[in-house]
Amino acid sequence: MAQVRETSLPSGSGVRWISGGGGGASPEEAVEKAGKMEEAAAGATKASSRREAEEMKLEPLQEREPAPEENLTWSSSGGDEKVLPSIPLRCHSSSSPVCPRRKPRPRPQPRARSRSQPGLSAPPPPPARPPPPPPPPPPPAPRPRAWRGSRRRSRPGSRPQTRRSCSGDLDGSGDPGGLGDWLLEVEFGQGPTGCSHVESFKVGKNWQKNLRLIYQRFVWSGTPETRKRKAKSCICHVCSTHMNRLHSCLSCVFFGCFTEKHIHKHAETKQHHLAVDLYHGVIYCFMCKDYVYDKDIEQIAKETKEKILRLLTSTSTDVSHQQFMTSGFEDKQSTCETKEQEPKLVKPKKKRRKKSVYTVGLRGLINLGNTCFMNCIVQALTHIPLLKDFFLSDKHKCIMTSPSLCLVCEMSSLFHAMYSGSRTPHIPYKLLHLIWIHAEHLAGYRQQDAHEFLIAILDVLHRHSKDDSGGQEANNPNCCNCIIDQIFTGGLQSDVTCQACHSVSTTIDPCWDISLDLPGSCATFDSQNPERADSTVSRDDHIPGIPSLTDCLQWFTRPEHLGSSAKIKCNSCQSYQESTKQLTMKKLPIVACFHLKRFEHVGKQRRKINTFISFPLELDMTPFLASTKESRMKEGQPPTDCVPNENKYSLFAVINHHGTLESGHYTSFIRQQKDQWFSCDDAIITKATIEDLLYSEGYLLFYHKQGLEKD
C-alpha cells in the first residue's frame, strides 16, 4: 500500500490531495482503509528510525534504499480528478557526501493523518509505541564577524596582521568591501598583504631612518628642545597655522593641514601618497583615502616612543640632547633631561613681555616685490586727518562704468582696512594692480621712485574724483574742488623781471609738491670743479655748517639771473632782454610735501646725494610767501594777507631711502599721535624716538597745517 502524504494548500483553492491511485469508495471502506493506513504509517516510522540509527554507526557509509514512488491525484471542485506523475521524495540519502565536521541529522518522516469526510466519525487509532527521540543536533559553528574598517590605528594583536587591500576586491568577484578576502585571511591565513603604496615606500633607501627622525623630532617630542623645534617648525606651509591636524609628507619636507586639505593638494601635485599624522603618528594613504596599518612602521613608531620614554625617565644627564638627536638611535646609552626638570618650563619668567605698540590705524603692509616705494607712500597718505575723514565717511560717489577700476574706491577700501583694528599686515595687491593699469610707466616689479609714485597716485585720484568736486571743474577748468586738490594743491608764483624796463610778468601755477635742490648737487655747486661730480657726495659738501630745510627753501625762493643764453621777450619793451626769475608761494596747501632731490644725472652718470639735511618738527612758511616779498618791497610793512600761526606746519611723516641708486630700500617714520613716532618698514612696525627721526636722511617730508590738525 502506498504511503500517504498530505500537503497543505491555501484555503478556498478547491484542490485536495489524495494518496493512492483509486477513485471514490463507500464510508465503511474508507474507515477500514484509514485504520490500516495508520498501522502501516506507525510501522514505517518505527522501521525508518531504527534503520537510520543503524546507518549512523556504519563504517563505511552504506546507501539507503530509495523511497517508494507514489502517484498523486488532484481533484477540483467540479469533481474531475487527474493523475500526476510520480515524484521521488527528496531526502538526504547515504549516497550523498556528508560534511566531515558534523554528523548527519535524522530527517523526520512525515506522519500520515486521516482526513475524515463530513458527517462520519472515524474510530480512534490503535495505540502505537512512541518512536525513540532523535539525537540532539550539534551546536552550529560560530560564524566569524565581518571586520568593519576603522579610521583608527590598529593595535597589534587586536586585529589580523594584514588589513584589507587598497582596492577591496582582490579577485574581481564583486566584493568591494573585501569581506570574502578577509574571511580567507582569518580561516586560512591568506588574503591581502596591506597597502601597496606603503610597500612601494618601503622599497626606497633610508626610509627607516627618515621615519625615525620624523617620529623622534615631530611626533614623540618629549624634551624642551624638541618641543620648541616642533612649535617653530610644525606649521602649515600654506596657511602658517598649526591647529588643523598637521600631517607631514613622508617623501619630502612639507607640513600641511589635513582639515583644510592643504596636505591633500600637495599629495595630488607632487604624487606623494603617504603622510604621517603629527599628533598620533598614524600613516594616511591618499590613494586609499584611509589610514593604513603596517607592521614595520608600527614597530618603528613603538621603538621610538619607548626610546624617548626611557630617556625621559632616566636619571643620567651626561649625554646632551644634541647627541641624542644626532645619534640616530645607535647609541643605546644616550639620555636627556630628567622629568623632574620639566616643571621649570612652565614657571613664569622674570622678564615681562614688552607692551604692544599697536594703535588703531597703524598696520603693516606686505611687500609684493620691490613695492616698498608704494608702502611708504600709503602709510603717509593714510595718516592725513582730512583724507582719513573723507574716506571713512564714504563721501566718494563713483561714476565709472566699472567701479573695480576706480582708484578712489580702492583707496576707500584701503582706509577701512587700515583702520579696521586688525593687527595682521595688509596686502595691497589691488592698489598695485590699479596703479599698473592707470600709470603704465610704474608697471612691473622693478625698483621705482617713491616721489614718482606719489605724483602718479595723486594724479589718478584727482582724475577719478572729478565728480566729487560738485561740477565746479566743468565751469572753470583751473578750479577743482576734489579732495586731492583741497588738501595738496598749492599756488606757486613765478615773477620774471625784465632787466631793461623792470616790468614784472607774473604766473601762478598749481603744484602738489615742492622739489628742493640740495647742497652738493649740480644746481648748487661750482661747475668749474668737475671733480666734485662723484657717485656719492659727503654730508659736509659746500656748506660749512649743517644745511637745513629752511636753507633749501631760501635757495628755492631766491632771485635767479637767467643770463644771456635765456633771453625772453618782454611784453613792455617788445624786445628780447635778460631777466631775473623768482619763485614764491602764492597759496599754501593744507599738506605741504617737500621733495629733497637726492637723485640726479650728470651726463651719463647717475648718482645719489647723501648730504644730511636737518628738518624741524615745526615749520613757518611765512618768509616764503609772495605777500612777504611784496611787503619787503614796501619798506618792511607786514604782509597784508598774513594771519599769525596760519602759515605754521607740523611734521607728520618722513620717507627715507637707504642704499644706492641701483639697489635701495624705502622706509618711513609716521606720527600716530602727538610726539609718538613709529618706524614702518613694510610689514614691520616699531616704536621710534624723535632722535631717530631727526637724524634720518630724509627724502620726502610731509607737513600739515597746524590749524587743521587733529591729534
Swiss-Prot record:
Q: Which residues bind Zn(2+) 1?
A: C195, H197, C285, C288
Enumerate composition-biased segments (Polar residues). Answer: 1-10
Record keywords: Zinc-finger included?
Answer: yes
Q: Which UniProt keywords apply?
A: Chromosome, DNA damage, DNA repair, Hydrolase, Metal-binding, Protease, Thiol protease, Ubl conjugation pathway, Zinc, Zinc-finger
Q: Which GO terms describe its molecular function?
A: chromatin binding; cysteine-type deubiquitinase activity; histone binding; histone H2A deubiquitinase activity; zinc ion binding
Induction note: By ionizing radiation (IR).
**Zinc finger, UBP-type: residue spans?**
193-311
Q: What is its main location?
A: nucleus
Q: Where is it expressed, tissue-wise? A: Expressed in prostate, brain, lung, aorta and kidney.
State how it assembles: Interacts with H2A.
Q: What is this protein called?
A: Ubiquitin carboxyl-terminal hydrolase 51
